[in-house]
Amino acid sequence: MLVYGPGGPAPVLKELALKFEEKTKEKVIVTAGPTPAWIDKAKENADLIFSGNTSMMDDFAKKIPSLSLENLSVLNVRPSGIIVRPNNPKNIKNFEDILKDGINVMVVDGAGQVGLYEDMALKSAKRENLVKLRKNIKIYAKNSKAAVDEWNNNPNIDALIIWSHWAKALGDDKALFIKDKNAVIYRAAEIASTKKGLENKKALEFVDFIKSKEAQKVWKKYTWKEVK
């Protein structure tokens, strides 16, 4: 079974794929990362496509003719927030702290995060928040992987607006995650079958498995909200 999608939800899907294989003896190969790295292969042989949010899935449907959104499943959600350096040297405690003078901010302006920083800045309907944030944004990364690579290589960046699970991926020695209830935005992972996947009984079973109660522990482990 061949499953493709972005890097964000991939750790969850890969761990659940191994658990599914243990239970059913059906091998699930999860290929993940920036879209250009896998989209051509996915067009040829994908059973399932997963995404990090709805606009990403809608875009996949335009690029992969065999992908059907009629049987799409909305999966778990995760919060946005701010990654800062370990020990928080700039003492960033909430969203408004990254609007202060002298804070160098990076955002992801592509993939599953188009418009995310704007949504966070304007959640309280304060126009001045976006004005200040725009002045502090130094880097617009094209996707999360590019942002994480830049974070690791550029110590001049003080704060990164991104999803919670990327802090876990970076590790405690490289990142501290700040969640501000006044700015948090939630978006959901999704999964859908191709025509090939619809004919694969095991693929449909895998979709049911990743939505199951048993799977929720794994989603939670990677900072996604459990589905009760």
Label for each model-derived stretch:
Residues 65-67:
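Conserved mixed alpha/beta catalytic, RNA-binding, or beta-rich assembly cores of soluble enzyme
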Residues 1-29, 36-46, 53-62, 73-228:
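Exported/periplasmic ABC-transporter solute-binding proteins
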